[in-house]
C-alpha cells in the first residue's frame, strides 16, 4: 500500500492550529477538500449571478417599459389599460405623479437587486452588498408607496392589491438574501484557506 505523502508533520500543524482532534486527512487530502468546497461555492455564485442578475435587470427594464412608460407617460385610455394601474386607477396630476414615483421606485428595486446579484461574478463583494442594500431600500419604499396608494388613491385595499404592492420588496429581499449567503460562503472559503495554510509560516 502506498504511504500517504505528508509535507509537514501533522502534530506540528495541529499544535499551530490548536487542533486536538484526531487527524483523519493528511495535508494533500485536506487541500483537495478545500478546493472542492471552493469550486462548489463558485459554481453556486455563478448561477446566482446569471439567474438572479439577468432576471432582476430584465424585470426592471420590462416593468419600466410596460408600466411606467406606457401608463404614466401615456395618459388617458392608455393609463387605464396599463396592467398594474388598473388596480390603482387614480385621477389628477398629483396622483399620477405619485404613481409615476411608485413605478420608478419599483423599477429601481428590480434593477438594483438584479445588478447586485450580477456583481457576484467578480470579487467585488462589498459592492454587491451595497447595491443589494440600495435595492432593498428602493423595494421597501416602492411597496409602502403602492400600499399607501391603494388606500388613499383607489380606496380598495384588499389582499390582491396588498400582494401586488409587496412584490418589489419581496424581490429585493430575496436578492439581498442571495447576495449575503454567497458573500458569506466566499468569505468562509477564504477563512478556511487561511487556517489550512497557517502552518506554512512555521
Residue map of PLM features:
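Generic alpha-helical transmembrane segments
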Residues: 93-116, 134-140
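Terminal transmembrane helical module of multi-pass membrane proteins
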Residues: 156-202
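Non-transmembrane, juxtamembrane loop and terminal tail segments
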Residues: 1-32, 185-202
Amino acid at each position: 500500500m502506498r504511504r500517504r505523502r505528508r509535507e509537514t508533520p501533522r502534530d506540528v500543524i495541529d499544535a499551530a492550529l490548536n487542533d486536538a482532534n484526531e487527524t483523519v486527512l493528511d495535508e494533500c487530502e485536506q487541500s483537495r477538500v478545500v478546493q472542492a468546497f471552493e469550486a462548489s461555492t463558485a459554481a453556486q455564485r455563478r448561477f446566482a449571478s446569471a439567474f438572479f442578475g439577468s432576471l432582476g435587470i430584465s424585470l426592471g427594464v420590462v416593468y419600466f417599459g410596460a408600466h411606467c412608460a406606457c401608463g404614466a407617460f401615456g395618459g388617458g385610455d392608455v393609463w387605464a389599460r396599463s396592467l398594474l394601474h388598473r388596480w390603482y386607477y387614480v385621477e389628477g396630476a398629483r396622483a399620477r405623479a405619485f404613481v409615476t414615483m411608485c413605478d420608478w421606485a419599483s423599477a429601481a428595486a428590480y434593477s438594483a437587486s438584479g445588478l447586485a446579484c450580477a456583481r457576484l461574478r467578480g470579487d467585488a463583494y462589498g459592492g454587491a452588498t451595497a447595491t443589494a442594500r440600495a435595492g432593498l431600500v428602493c423595494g421597501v419604499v416602492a411597496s409602502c408607496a403602492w400600499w399607501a396608494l391603494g388606500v388613499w388613491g383607489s380606496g380598495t385595499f384588499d389582499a390582491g392589491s396588498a400582494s401586488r404592492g409587496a412584490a418589489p420588496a419581496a424581490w429585493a429581499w430575496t436578492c439581498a438574501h442571495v447576495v449575503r449567503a454567497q458573500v458569506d460562503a466566499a468569505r468562509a472559503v477564504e477563512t478556511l484557506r487561511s487556517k489550512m495554510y497557517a502552518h506554512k509560516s512555521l
